[in-house]
Every structure is written in C-alpha cells, then in structure tokens.
Amino acid sequence: MESPPESMAERKRRLVAGELRDAALMLLATKGFDAVTVDDIAAVAGVSRRTFFRYFASKEDVVVRFLADMGASVVTELAARPRAEPPSAALRHAIWVPLAACTDRADHTERARIVVRLILDTPALHARWLDRQSRWRDALAAELAARHRLDPDTDPYPRMAAGMAMLALDTVLRQWQPGADEQRLAELTDQAFAVVAPALDTPGASQP
C-alpha cells in the first residue's frame, strides 16, 4: 500500500526541521558544542527562538535526531537483506548505509566527521549516543533472532551479534580521521567486520 501524499503543512514542517538541523550541525562543527546557543541556531536558520522549540527540545535534541535517523536506517537495512546472506555481510551492509550517507558530498563528509567527534568527545552527547546504541542493539537483536529463528531470552547469539555490530560501528567512527573519503570509510568498515565475522557467522553455535 502506498503512503498518502505529503501535505503542504507536513512538507513545510519537514523543510524547516531540516534547515534547523543543518544550521545546528554546521555551527556545532565549526564552533564546538558549548559555544553554540539555540539563538545562534535559530538565527542561522532564519527563524525565531520560539520556532526552534516547536521542532527541538534543545540543541542536544538536534544531535539525538541525527543519531536516531542513523539507527533507524541500520535496522531497516538489516531487515531488507536476504535471509540466506551470512550475518556478517548483512550486518556490514546495514552499518555501512548510514556511514555512506555521511559522505555523499565532500563538504558534508567533513562536517559529519566533526559532529561525530563532538558526539564522542562531549559527555552530554556521548551519554545520548550510548543510550541510542542500546536501543539499536535491542532492535538489531530482535531482527537477528527472527532471521535465525532463535530465542533471544535463551540464546546469547542475537544480543552478542548485535553488540559486535555496534562495536564495529563505534570503532569505525573513532578511527574516522580528517580527509578520509568514502573509500577510506569503507576500508575501515571492512577491517572492523573482518575481526568479528567469524563469530557473527556462527548463529546457533551456542546451542547444545
């Protein structure tokens, strides 16, 4: 069934939210998290402070939405992979999609890298990052359990595999250096999954 067409109000709301997100990420990337205020973000986006708070609860919330979009795509991509595909390949693809989206333009790549560093290095943002990772891990574990017909309450594989996938993502992000392009990110992703692939590709091995 096709989704209903987007209304004018929905389109406007999506566009304004996107402008606020882009303004926030640009400022955070160039000035640092603590130096940016909500007023700064609203001014760059060309809206009022009140309008900002119609879309986001705080500047932290802008980054959390950025993370939420990344996590949602990971789970969606895994669910779309062929059931016969090795788990390491399916999870590698699922993790790679949001990473590749960060490198769709040269200017976007460096901005995304800096924002990722802010997330990892700013305690308030890193706490949100860990919370989001926990949610993604649960969602990935549920999908892996369904794919391999395992009970996540009795078989450790789904949660362990989901945790390894999240660890691979975290490792790639931490190794993302200035000037790294899409090819370099792909190499880092391959290296991370090469480490965990032997364990990922043995679903059910924990069963007696």
Tell me the role of every PLM-derived stretch:
Residues 128-132, 158, 162-182, 198-204:
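Amphipathic C-terminal alpha-helical segment
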Residues 1-31, 35-47:
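Basic, helix-initiating cap at the start of DNA-binding domains
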Residues 40-43, 52, 91:
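Append "Primarily bacterial transcriptional regulators
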Residues 28, 37-38, 59-70, 91, ...:
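Amphipathic alpha-helical segments enriched in hydrophobic/aromatic and basic residues
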Residues 7, 31-33, 53-63:
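HTH DNA-binding helix-turn interface
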Residues 122, 134-161:
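Hydrophobic alpha-helical bundle segments that form small-molecule/ligand-binding pockets
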Residues 72-115:
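Hydrophobic alpha-helical connector segments
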Residues 3, 142, 146, 178-208:
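C-terminal peripheral helix-coil segments that are non-catalytic and often amphipathic
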